[in-house]
Amino acid sequence: MRIVLVDMPWSAIDAPSLALGILKRRVLDVFPNASVDVVHANLDYVDWLTAHTGFTFEEYDFCASSYFSGHSEWIFSAALNEQPHWNVREFNESIGEKVPEPLLAKARELHELAPRFVRDIAARIAAGAPDVVGFTTTFAQNAAALATARAVKSFAPYAATVFGGANCDGPQGAALHRNFPFVDFVVRGEGEATFPQLLTALRHGDGDGDEGDGGSGSSDRDGEGGLSGISGLCWRDSGGRCVANPMEDKPLPPGALVTPEYGDYFDRHARSTAGSWVEPRIVVEGSRGCWWGEKHHCAFCGLNGSFMEFRSKNPQRFVDEILGLVERYRILDVWVTDNILDMAYLTSMAPRLQESGYDLRLCYEIKSNLRREQLRTLSAAGIGYIQAGVENLSSRVLQLMDKGVTGCQNVRLLRDAETVGMNLNWNYLYGFPGESDEDYDAICDQAPALHHLTPPFNATRIKVERFSPYFDQPELGFDELRPAAHYRHIYDLPESELAELVYLFDSRDLGVSPSCLDRLKRAVSGWKDAYLHCRLTHCDLGDRIVLVDTRPGFVWRLLDLTDPLEVAVFRLLDMPHSPASLLRKAAARHEDATEERITELLDRWRHMGIVFTDGGQCIHVAPVAANQDLMRLDGSRLHSAEPLAPALAASPAAPAAPTSAPTPVTVTVTATGGTGGTG
């Protein structure tokens, strides 16, 4: 059996597809004699475009990150709908004010070129006479994958086309199968069990037992063990009727999660133009689901879809998997896809990674209430980049989200990440039902005090996502949902079908007023501009604490705390405290601790930008002095570095990128002086 698995744009060009790596490994385990090839069509697209037109990393990166606007998927809409000028005017009108004209013009050019690329890649896939062609589709891959599946079917009608991935979960998968007849099968849910079962059914569909029947995806094998017995599968019966089997009600146990097989991806990346743009990363998973979401599903989050149940791999097995992949592919940068850190890994997985002796550089998603020593443990294990789900700094808004943290805890994370030298990524989210301008005014007032801490990437209005509580429970505030407007420019489908197919939904704007929103965005923009030039640190010398400040919003530069009460209060403010608890603890050791003095001290420190207050609590914002200048990434300059490999970029195997195209280099500098690209 010949199987081709396809990773279409706009997936990341610095990492292989975890989903396809897992499926390849699983298929080879079940069918050792099968031929399983992965087509890295995202890399092929980069090379194809640089050969046919000017194309830069910034342009690919912009498209890959524009899922919420529909910019990237519209590029493949002409190929999907087989109409060369599909909704060009409508696209310009809907997105023109949001996108700079050069990027808008590039999108129109790519839109015109997309049908040619789709034909080329489909012809190449079909030339290998595959029995099965599988497409993974997550976020902005849908239009490109569907367009290519249509083209593959025209070149090789005998091949069975199969879709899977996050865009196929639940009703989305059934709608995709129902509306696109060139898609023979859709695997909904976790594919490790379902996909091999489908291959078995196809393989037994003809006399010699070697080839699948492919074609229409119809079958009369609807008895026990046939297509009707495969959980979550969408298929067509002998009369052409779409059938959606009930999905599995229990997720796979952690022992069933296999190690991905990435084959020749890293060699292919090195030969691609993308190899001169970004360093590659290994992708792994230690867990699936979300243990916090099992207890308190964050109101806006649609991740995990049908399976929220948290499952994590045995820590030693996970460590062995990471180190095995690192040793095999000779790459130290690792991207962990877990939605949340298994807290047990802090005392199991993390110490074992540290003991490995490798200078690993891992990216991990964590809950934002981790403390400094826990961050140190992760940092020592090589986890230097975190996505922390900070989302907001107002306790009241965080409570509306059901995040399970406070504003002061989030500020503590920003402060302590600066102390231990961890880089982090977060967005400031707004637009929650029940929030008010007052929830943002106090934060905007205090923003200059935080300019030395990692700023949010942006201030972003939430979109309602399928599977989120906001989607499932209209009583929470979003009671008039409709498919996001940009989908109408991509798919030629009625609203009722889009409502089943898509992941994002439009709603009326809720929450903050326009004037407050303008203030928030100005505060975030000012924070981002100031961050690279601002420092605030403290050094605890035992009997005194010295603070050094370079933030332009404050007039002081050096503060020497020598008063025993002030030293004690500052140390207490390492953790969030209410004024009452501060007074109680300080008074237990210092007779001069009075309510008036504590109040005066907190007011003075807030005026100096030393203390952040929210929700009746306060916390100091000064990281421990630890050579922060050596441990920061200058994100504003990542796209202006020299090419990683100019000779490689110009090699015959990989068409040269235009000499004017800036190419990013990300360098992490550790406290010990080691460096390494993180891509």
Tell where the protein language model's regions lie, with residue ranges:
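Glycine-rich beta-alpha loop elements in corrinoid/cobalamin-binding modules
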Residues: 2, 9-19, 23-47, 93-96, ...
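Conserved C-terminal portion of the radical SAM core fold
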Residues: 3-6, 326-336, 361-363, 384-390, ...
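Radical SAM [4Fe-4S] cluster-binding motif and immediate context
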Residues: 254-420, 432-433
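C-terminal scaffold of the Radical SAM
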Residues: 438-568
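Short capping segments at the starts of secondary-structure elements
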Residues: 572-581
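Short amphipathic alpha-helical interaction segments
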Residues: 591-604
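A short, conserved structural fragment
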Residues: 606-617
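Short, amphipathic alpha-helical interaction segments positioned at domain boundaries
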Residues: 617-653, 664-667, 671-673, 679
